Amino acid sequence: MTVSKKNTNSEAYLRMFTQMVRIRTFEDNANQLYLSAKMPGLTHMYSGEEAVAVGICEALRITDKITSTHRGHGHCVAKGAEFKQMFCELLGKEEGYCRGKGGSMHIADQSNGNLGANAIVGGSMGIATGAAFSSKLLGADDVTVCFFGDGATAQGLMYEVMNMAALWKLPVIYA
């Protein structure tokens, strides 16, 4: 029994490491596109934060939801987004997740439970809380994860939604 558990852990660790490498590879390629002026708009890299997205998304199911930040590429990849559609989105192509209209800071893949990135600092917190409220009302066994950065801690919305989530016992994790 112990041997199989070790194998399972080794497989999980390898899967998570591979996912972290995939995110870094995506970010390196996206950065090159940006620096070569082939990508319209701005981009904010997620390099160095890969373990956060992978560790959290590894525990989620496809029906669980996430919301993201302006540095959302890693969250998207960790939740199962395809590179081709992500790069198409970054390049403004119709084949992108948002038909090329969202760009780097607004990628969403609802088929994988990714409700989208948000360029507004702390802007996805209300969306995540609303998604968790919806899950609770519908009796779904889903959780919503709201990724946010340190800048969001200066936004009043953060404290308002955390208070609401605690009072209403919503299935949301602020990470």
Model-assigned labels for residue ranges:
Residues 18-34:
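N-terminal glycine-rich anion-binding loops that anchor highly charged ligand groups
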Residues 168-175:
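A short, conserved beta-to-alpha structural element at the edge of catalytic cores
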Residues 1-16:
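Charged, compositionally biased N-terminal leader segments and the immediate start
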Residues 1-5, 28, 62:
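Short, compositionally biased low-complexity segments
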Residues 3, 25, 97-101:
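N-proximal short alpha-helices
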Residues 12, 20, 41:
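Conserved acidic
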Residues 31, 38-168:
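Cofactor-binding active-site loop characterized by glycine-rich and histidine/acidic residues
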